[in-house]
């Protein structure tokens, strides 16, 4: 039986990431990352959020809108395996899927009433680009959603060690104080593709309206420049 379903975004995420580069590979890896969930006008009804304040964490169901493809492949190359080993798409969290749907667990830091955007959700630890469409929100329920005994397959442990981050004082001054911890956390996760390890190469990405450039040698990441994002 052939079926199709049409869905529309209920909200959009507003985060510090203007591009995919730099976005943490999973939610919760950088707890200090702040973002907001702003509902579409049709769904700005406070009754729909009644009771959500009692939960510390929520699930975001969202769309890989930057990775939509007409065709799909049954196997993909997970970056954490070096980009050479193929695994079944349903054994990975690759964005290149038959239905480009994603799931992120984030901390609900607060709910704020605004005059022009209705109730806005303040969240921590998100792994989404700015503007990402949200399809649904569900509460995280510890007794049902937490499984400490679960096996993690080829992703049983975090991907690699965190890096030592060096930001020269004159560059750190360019970063707003309320973004410094988050920036360090993002850089410590090593934003580079896993298969790239050129100590001479300078990488760059947009974060909180800034263009951050860095290089990595061994286990140390050094920020080379911070400027206003164009």
Locate each region found by the language model.
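Conserved positions in beta-strands of structured domains
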Residues: 14, 106-109
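Mixed-charge, low-complexity intrinsically disordered regions
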Residues: 1-101, 113-230
């Amino acid at each position: 039986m052939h079926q199709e379903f049409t869905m529309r975004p209920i909200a959009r995420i507003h985060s510090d990431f203007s591009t995919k580069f730099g976005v943490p590979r999973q939610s919760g890896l950088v707890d200090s990352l702040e973002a907001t969930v702003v509902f579409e006008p049709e769904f700005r009804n406070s009754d729909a959020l009644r009771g959500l304040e009692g939960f510390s964490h929520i699930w975001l169901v969202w769309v890989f809108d930057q990775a939509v493809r007409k065709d799909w492949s049954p196997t993909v190359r997970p970056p954490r395996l070096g980009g050479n080993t193929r695994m079944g798409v349903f054994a990975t969290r690759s964005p290149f899927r038959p239905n480009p749907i994603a799931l992120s667990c984030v901390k609900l830091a607060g709910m704020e009433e605004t005059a022009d955007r209705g109730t806005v959700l303040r969240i921590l630890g998100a792994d989404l680009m700015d503007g990402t469409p949200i399809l649904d929100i569900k509460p995280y329920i510890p007794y049902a959603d937490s499984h400490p005994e679960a096996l993690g397959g080829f992703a049983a442990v975090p991907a690699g060690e965190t890096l030592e981050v060096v930001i020269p004082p004159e560059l750190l001054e360019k970063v707003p104080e309320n973004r410094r911890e988050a920036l360090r956390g993002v850089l410590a996760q090593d934003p580079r593709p896993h298969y790239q390890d050129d100590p001479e190469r300078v990488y760059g990405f947009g974060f909180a309206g800034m263009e951050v450039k860095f290089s990595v040698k061994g286990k140390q990441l050094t920020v080379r420049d911070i400027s206003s994002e164009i």
